[in-house]
Each structure stands twice: as C-alpha cells, then as structure tokens.
Amino acid sequence: MVRAQETVYDLITKCSVRRVPPKQFVNFYNEFFNERYDSVLENGNPAGESRPTAPVYEEVAQDLVRILNDSRVNLVADYVLEIVLINLNVDLLRLFLPKLHHVRNVMLLVHLFSRATAFISGLDNKLLAEQISDTVYTDVTPAVLSFNMQAIDDQLVIVLAKFLHAVLRLPEGQQKMGSVPTKQKAATLLQRLSTIDRLLYKRFIADLDGKLRLSGAPADMSFPLPPSNMPSPSVTSPKYETSSVGVMKRSTSMSNEAKYQDIKLARYYKNLWLNNKIHYCTVSDPLFLEKYDSILELATGGGLSADRPVKAKIADLVETAFTCFAQFVSNKLYHQSNSNFSLLERKWTVFVTKQLPLIIKSSIPDKTDIVLRTLENIDDKVIKAIKSYNTEKEEVKNRTEDLFDDYPVNSLDIRHEFLKNLIMMGLQPPTVLNEYLREDQMVDLKSLVTSEHLIIDNSQGVRETILNVRNFITKSIESLEFENLFDDGNQLLVTNDHGIIQIAHNLETISPTKQLEIANILYDLLSAAIESLDHKTISKVLTILTLNVGHLLTNIFCLTGYEKFARAVIRFIDVIWESNKSKSNDMVSDDSEFENINSAMAYTLSLCFIIHVVDIYGVNVEALVENPSKSTVLRFLSKLGEIPEVFVAPEGDLESSKTLLQQWLRELFVKNLISDNLMKSADVKVMGFMIPFIFKQTLLNVEYGIISDISSFVNGFEYFLQPFLSVGLINIVFWLEKYLLALKTTESFPKINGALFDILGAIIAPKSIGSDAKAIHSVVLKLKCVGLLKELKSFQVPSESNYGIYSSQTRQDPRLEALISKLELIAQSSALYDVDPRIISAVNNNYSQKHISYNKVVLTSDIPINKIMTNQINSFWNLHSSTYYNFDYLLELIDLVTPFKFVQDVFQTLKYKVTAYGVPGSATKPSSAALDQVLGYVFYFMVLRDIKCPEEKSLLLEYLDSGRFPSSISATVLTSDPTTISGMPPVSMPYDVKSEQDAMEGVDEDFDMLFGESFSGLPDDVQKSADMKPDTGIKEDDSEKSSYVSAARLTESFGVIFSKMKKDKLEAYQAGQISEERYQCFMGLYDKYVQTLRHSVI
C-alpha cells in the first residue's frame, strides 16, 4: 500500500533516480493514483454522483509544478508529458497548464514543450487529436500566452511558438481570441519572435491569422513585421538558396561573408550528421528525414523548416548525399593513403543505392521527377570526384601483371546504381537511365530489372520470380546443410546456388524493398527459433550472418539497425539458454546426442556472432543485456583472450572443477577417446573455459620442456573441433594471438617451433573435419584470422638476396606454410573490413612491394602520428570541412592520441594559427569571430562523437550543469590510458586480472574497457546492477527495464574533458596562476561546446 504522506512529487523523484522509462512510469503512476486517491474520491461523494476530481487534480498539478521547479533531470519532463498529454487527462491538463508560467526551470520547460511539440506533430490517433483540439482555444492557448513574454528566455520563446504552431493546426475553423490582455501577450510573443527567428515568425503569424480572429485588437496594438535587414538563412544547400530583399540591401563584404559562412556551416552540419547516422547504422530512424531537415537551426539559429514541401526536403537530401559521398571518397582517395578503412565506404554505398530510394518511396512515391532534376543539377566537381573514384576502383579490380593489357572501362558509377534501384521500385521508367547517361554510355534496357520481385536462378538454371518471399526464405533455411556450404578444404563456396546464399551474393540486383523484407524475415525466423529452441535454425541463420556472405549482414544492419538482432542473440544466451539449461543437462539418452550437438553449435555460433558485431560494427553489448550482474555474455566477453592459471568452472568450486578437469584430461590424452556419457553430459558453458585452459597449459608445458612427446596431445586436440567442444576455440584464438606475439621474443621458440606448428595445425589446419564442425571452425577462425596471420607470418624466415637483388620469397617450415595458407583462404573468403586489401585478395604478387599493414592506420617513421595530427589540424584551420566526413578515420585517430591530447593539440594550434594568420580565404583581418568560425566545425564533430542517443545528451548536459552524473549512473574516473579511451579496442586487449574473484567483481570495468563504445544511436533498455561495482551503480530491479547509458561512453566524452578542464582552469585562475583573459578565453570555448551540445540534432 502507498503511505498516506507520499505524493506524486515523491513518486517522480524516485522514478527519475532509477531512470525508469516514461512508458513504465505511467504504470507506476496509475497504480499510485488508484491507491492514493480512489478512496478520497469515493468518500467525497457517497451519493454516487459524479466524483469531485478538482481537488485531487489540483494537488497533482501543484506537485507537477513543484517537481519541474526543483529537478534538473529531463526525464522528469518526460514523465509530466506522459501523464498530462500523451495519456490525456483533460481535467488535469486544465488545472496544470495555467500553472506552468510559475515554473522557473527554463531547461525543463524547454524540454517539456519540445517533446510536446514532437508528440503533437506526429499524432496519428484521430480520437486523441479531437480531444486535444477541444482544449486548444479554451485552455492550451491562453495558458501558453500567460507566460511573461517580455522576460522569458529566447529559447523558451521559440519552443512556445513551435508548440502553439503545432497545436493550432489540430482544430478546424477560426476562434475569436479571448481578452485584450491575451491579444497583447500574443503581440508581445510575435514581437520577440520577429527578432529571434524570422522564419518561424512568418509561419506563426499565419497560424494566428488563420485560426484566431484578431480584428478586435486595440488600435495601438499592431503585429510587428520582421526587420527588413534580418538575413533569411538558406534552407538547403547553396544551390537551393533563396534571395532576400533584406540581404540584398546589405552592402558590406562582412555581411556577405557571414551569410556565406552560415550557408557553408549549414551544409557541413548536414553532411557530418549524415556521415554519423550512416556510420552508426541509424538511418532506419522513422524521423530521419525530419531530423535531417531540422539541422538548419543548429547552423544558423533559424526556425524550423517543417513547413517546407517534402519534395524540397528530398531534393536537398539527394543533393547533399551525393555531394557528401563525393567528398568522402575524394578525401579517402587522396588524403588517407596511410589507412585501411572500408566499412564506412560500404555503408555509404548501401545508403545511396538502397536506403535513399526507400526514403524517396516512403516520402514522395508519386512525385519522383524532382529526383532526376536534382541529379542533373549536381555540381560538376561532385560528378568528377565520383567518376575518378569509380575509375580508380575499376583499375584496381582489373589490374594485371601485363602493363600493356587492356581492360574494359565501366563508366557506370553510383549515380547510375541509384537510378537502377529507383527503376526496380517503379519510381522511374527504364528509359531514364539512358537519358541521364547521354554521352557516357548506353545501356541495353532489356537487361535492366524493372520489378521489385525477387528473381533467382533455380536448380535447372531457369530464372524464377519469387512471389512469396517469406515462404522461400523459410524453406531455404530449412533445406540448408552445412556440408553444402563448404568445400573439402572447408572454404565457403562462392558459387553455391542455394536460395539464401544466392540472394546474399546478388544483393546489388535485389530491390531495396525486398532487401528490407528479407532482413525482417531473417529476424523473424531467428527470433522464433530462439523462443522455440530450434537450435538448427539458429545455427544456420547465424552462420550466414557472421560469415557476412555477400556483405549480407552489413546490408541488413544498414537497413534495420543492429540492435534488434544483437538483442535477440544476447537474450538467447543470457535468458533462454539459462532457463532451459537444466533440461539440457538431463538429456543423456541416445536420442539426445544430435540435439546436444545442435544446441552446442547454436550456443557457440551465438557467441561468435556477438563478438563479431562488437568487433566489426562497434555494437555496445552492455546496453542490450537484460541483467548485467547475471549476464553470461558480459562475463565471457570480459574475459575474452584471458585464460586463468587455475581452472574454476562457472558456478562451480575448485574441487569439483579439478575433478572434472582430470576426467577430461584422462579421456582426451590417455584414452584418446571420449565416452558417450561424458560427451552427452558436457556443459558447453563450462567447455568454453575448460578447453582453452587445457590448451594453454599444454603449450606452456611444451615451451618449458616438460612435455616432449606431443603426439597424444595432437590427437586429443582434434576433439576440440567437435561441435560440443568447439566453443573453447573462441578463447583459444584470441589468447593465441597474444601468446605468439610474446613467444617471438623468447629463446625457447627455435627449440619448440616444430611442436608448436604441429599443435596449431591440429586446430587451425586439420587434415579432416566433420561436416557439422565446418561451420563453427570457419566462423571462429574468421574472428581472428588477420591477427593470427600477422603473428604467424612474423615467424617466416626471409631468403638470402640473389645477386644483390632483394626478393620477398621466403623459406619456411611446410607446417607453418600450411597454417598461413589456411588463414589466408579464410580471409579471402570472408567479407572483412578495415584491413589491407592484399590480405583479403587472392592475387599473389611475389614482386617487391611495401609491407602489408595489419592496422587501420599505418604509422611509420615517414608518417608518424605527429605528422598526421599536424596535417589534420591544418585541414581544420583551412576549413576543409570534407576532412571531417571520414568519420571512421577521425575516430581511430582520436583513439590513437587519446581524446584529452586531441582536445589540447587542436585548440592550442587553432588558436595560434587563427590569431597569427586568420582564416584562409577570408578577406577580413584576424578577429575573435574568426576562431568561432573555425571552431564551429570542430565542436559539432565533437558533439556527434560524444552522444549517440537523446538519453546520453540529457545526462551529459546534467553533468555539465552539476559536475556529476546522477547517482543511478555508474561512472568511472576519466583516464588517459589509451585502452580505456573511446572507440572500441581490439577484443584481444590484455587485462590486469589478479585473481578469479577480482575478475568476477570487475566484470563491468573490464567490459567497459573492451566494449564501452555505443554506436546504436537508439535508447538502451537495460539497468546495470549495483553489485557489479562496490562504489557506484544502478539499483537492481529484475522486473523493470530502464534506459541504460554506458558510463564509459560518457566519461570518455569531450564534454567530460571540458568539464574537468573548466574546474582546473577555475582553480588556476583563483590561485593567480593564469590571467583573467586566458580563463575567459577557455570559458568561451566551453560555452560554445555546451551551446552546440544543447541544440544538436541526434
């Protein structure tokens, strides 16, 4: 029962501390309200008449106003919005709104009205819209106009106007405005708005004229016109810029330059935001187009462009997309020869060719003529950059040993692929391709796919149209057999004509709508299989996805985001598997043998999938688990690459673990035969830790000379490839990379190299392997093939020079050669990203060439990190905004130098250069405004790196205001240690684990070091348990889910760095160590960052 003295104020306070999601808060509120006030309502009216609600809602309204004044947590405003407007309570709304002008907390008021505006704008519930519209003239408008329009903050003026702009569209017809004071307040609001936001002013006064009759206003009260000299910011790119009489009248070059910089900054913000959304696979956001179009506010301080025609928005997006892509590939081609990035390029290709057509179809399906006009108006420099990039790619693809060998040049580029997809979707006629190509190249129209239908080649070689895609995919997965996926050498068959494999290899010819449908079908199949424990289907789907056949997984993540797939697989291991573990352990009959194998495969492949999406796509797993303190996934990943000196089974004690270990050692290496009972009772979760322990101890004993005859061990290791034991291979390959790196520096290697290669051959390049084990073996090796290749190739011995001529030919142990060949084949058959192209190329060029790099950014004596940073900062100073567009490159660079040093170097150098030389290309002399101009680009990049979702934005702003995170958010101390700085370090990063107990207590900390980065761009529904860290943490509540934000992500942000620098600068200033001018200079930078963060579009 609720105690009598508890109030709504108390409820909101407690829920905000716990970070309870707004939707869940409503349930708590309803329960609280029923228990707290039902008796009051009933007792107040025993006659059974209508219940007296006014006193009750008056008390609730006062509590809401009080909490809005007292709290600094944006979540509180979300709660208020839920119970007043979203779950509409007209009685409460009529009592609450008139009290809002008493709230002095501007931050929460702005957040409240912003969220309310977004809700009203997207309202599609007709009944609710009618109910709200009934209150617009009688309650909402008078309440909003009751604010002191002369005294309130500019930002609050804007959000109030936007809110009224949205709600006045709900009712039909005109309504006479109430009293003269109300009209005067409306006039005051318009007066303020005309000096703050001209575009919004024009739309708002149109609303008042159309919805409210103003003819009865006093004669001396006239609605102000906007200042004629107020610039009207461009709503799109420079090509779509509209002229303004006021702008034309400005004759000074400084005004023209300021306008040009506004246009340039607006375009830059759009481009960088677009790169950010593509990089983090969040283009599938339903509000993508609206958010993109609202970025203008951030750059110019102008009003919303919500009233702009959808055609204009699409035209702007198409033009910006191709311009941004051209700048991206041009910068990559000419300025980043020292890097090996390819994943973002692939995502960009998917966005332009597949996602952009989907956005067009959902927005203007019948008005796509604007798209072709936009393409034709693209700047010639953009077209030239795209053509140059396409030519370079074709040359690399067709390059041969013969210098005189000619090859056909394909003049089709990404623009034409974009048009082909529009043609597939019926948004353009086939003839448009040749019309657009004109002099470039003619295309046989009969060869074009002009239908959205899925078309495949059946087993008879006949092209077949698939009408029921779901049924086709389902049957394709059911009939898929692992032995048909791989050849005798355990290599993935590229020429496989099986349904789902054929689809994966022909994604370019499949329409965007069908690709999205296929992605959703695969998710549905995976989810259904997880819920029903269909281990075979889970294994098949995850094998195809983890191997990324034909870049299928990348396309799926681009189209749908990665959160739902990752969350489903994590739930399988943490929840479904654990809840059915006892049943699995009881399966010891002969009939259960195959089911045990299937379940072990599903478990192992699920872990591999999770590791793969974290390592390649930067998925923040910690934000997706339901119960961090009990998560098997978190525990496994936090120890990835670490094998303890003493084996203790999960959920077991030392003695029982010792007995189990001895039993397996006897079966593996003495009897060389695993009994049926031991096989059937094997717990795959335990095997994941025991098998790596056995492997490590064997290698160490061989290295120390304790074991000399390895034949029995080699034979025993062959069992590690069996599906029920292969889970141990995961930790083995991650630990092995570090072990080989350390082994090179020891004196024991020459003595044991033969034995070492024999042992490695048993698990990496076995002579034979079962059909069921092929899939797991290939998937596990893919996770670390590049790292293992790097270390194994370092054992190669270069041959002596031949007559003074250098040769890269090597003489090596044939067993080592077999290991390297196997890993090279794995790399070549896998869709790997961000690696040297020669690693994944089947072409073997034995001529002298530069060394293969195994890092994303190549650092040499000729190109050290200092030189790279100098070039990057010079690009910032030159306002070469395209240098920001290679988001992946910049993130890696920041990780290399650490965020703190990046901030220091960038700001110190930029301040010096701008002060000494001004801004390149500017006609004006260096000024304080020049530094702001340069930093406008830098700050927006920093903000987009810092925050991935609205929750992180709110929490970071709270931290900057109060100097601390809420007690419910687990926060770690900011460090300059590069292993804990933003970006996802390799999953093989070594840890300092002192004991098994220490590791258990530090699961969360270790995991943040590995996977602290979050790229989801979406709210994370999970809570962190308080018992994972003794100092800080979230209170555990198994029954609830909450929006979870990784502490490591926030503490590694530039915002936290600025906050700590602010504190240090203030202490230094107060101690007289720095001048007031220097302190104020820093505070200007700090305020600029906070302002950019506060107004940023996520």
Curated annotation (Swiss-Prot):
Molecular function in Gene Ontology: transcription coregulator activity
Listed Pfam families: Med5 (PF08689)
Subcellular location(s) per record: Nucleus
Entry keyword set: Activator, Nucleus, Transcription, Transcription regulation
BP GO terms, sorted: positive regulation of transcription elongation by RNA polymerase II; positive regulation of transcription initiation by RNA polymerase II; regulation of transcription by RNA polymerase II; RNA polymerase II preinitiation complex assembly
Positions with biased composition (Basic and acidic residues): 1021-1041
Gene Ontology CC: one annotated term: mediator complex
Renumbered residue ranges of the record's region Disordered: 1019-1041
InterPro entries in the record: Mediator_Med5_fun (IPR014801)
Domain of life: Eukaryota
Family classification: Belongs to the Mediator complex subunit 5 family.
Subunit structure: Component of the Mediator complex.
Annotated function: Component of the Mediator complex, a coactivator involved in the regulated transcription of nearly all RNA polymerase II-dependent genes. Mediator functions as a bridge to convey information from gene-specific regulatory proteins to the basal RNA polymerase II transcription machinery. Mediator is recruited to promoters by direct interactions with regulatory proteins and serves as a scaffold for the assembly of a functional preinitiation complex with RNA polymerase II and the general transcription factors.
Identification of the protein by name: Mediator of RNA polymerase II transcription subunit 5
Annotated organism of origin: Eremothecium gossypii (strain ATCC 10895 / CBS 109.51 / FGSC 9923 / NRRL Y-1056)
Classification lineage: Eukaryota, Fungi, Dikarya, Ascomycota, Saccharomycotina
